[in-house]
Amino acid sequence: SSTELPNTFNNQGRKRRIISSWWWYNALNQRTLKHKLTFFLHTSFTVSKDAGTGTSTHFYDHLQLLDFYAYGNIKTLAKKITFDNSMLIYLDNTSNNANNPNENYAREFLELFTILKGPQIDNGDYTNYTELDIQQAAKIFSGIKIQYDRSIIDSDTNLPSGRISVSNHENTNKTFSHAFNNQTISVPYFSILKDGIAISSIQRNVNDPNLTITNFKKFFEVHKQSFKIIADEI
C-alpha cells in the first residue's frame, strides 16, 4: 500500500493501475446489480488499462461512462462511446482522417458494439454487414478526435467527450451495401453527427434479438455465481 495521493504520481501507468484496481474490486465484490452490469459492459466496450488509452483521467472517464449507462440503453451507449476519449485512442479513431482513413473503430463498432458479425456468406460479406460497410462507417467516424484537456463536456452524461474536426471529416456521400438496403447518407450532415443521427443509421440491427440473447448469455456466464448468491439470500 502507499500513503501517496494519486495526483502526486508522475507515472500515468501507475495511476491507471490504481484506478483499475479500485474499479475491479468494486465490480467483483459489490453485490449490487449496477456493478455487475458495469463490469459486463466492460467485457464488450473494452479499452486497456495500460498504455494506448490516454491518461489515467481518460481511463477513469471511460469507466464512469460505463457506470452511467449500466441501467441505460446499449444503443445510446454505442453512440456515446464513439466520442469517449479513451476509446478514440484505443481503437485509433483519433487517427481516422479523410485523407488517411483508419477502419479499426468502424470494424469494432459493427462487429462487437452493435449488429455483430454473422456467418460469412461471401468474400467480405458477414451477413449483417460487409467490408464496404466498414469502409463507409469509417468515413462517418472520420474527424472525431480526442480532446486531451477534457474541456468538452457531454450534456447528457456530464462527462468529458471527444471533439469533431470538420477539416478531417470525409465530406462525401456514404453508400452502404445490400446489408443496409444500399442506404446512402448524404452530405452535409456533419452538424448533426454529435447527436447520433448519422451513427443511428448504421445501427439498424442493434435491437436484433440475437444481439440481446448473445449479450444475456455472456452476462449470465460471467455472473452466474453472483446470481446463485443472490438467489440463496432471497
Task: List where the protein language model places each region.
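Active-site substrate-binding loop specific to GH73 endo-beta-N-acetylglucosaminidase modules
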Residues: 2-5, 19-23, 56-234
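Post-signal peptide N-terminal segment of secreted/secretory-pathway proteins
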Residues: 3-15, 24-28, 52
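Amphipathic interfacial helices
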Residues: 17-19, 28-36
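Short, flexible active-site-proximal loops enriched in glycine and acidic residues
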Residues: 33-37, 49-57, 100
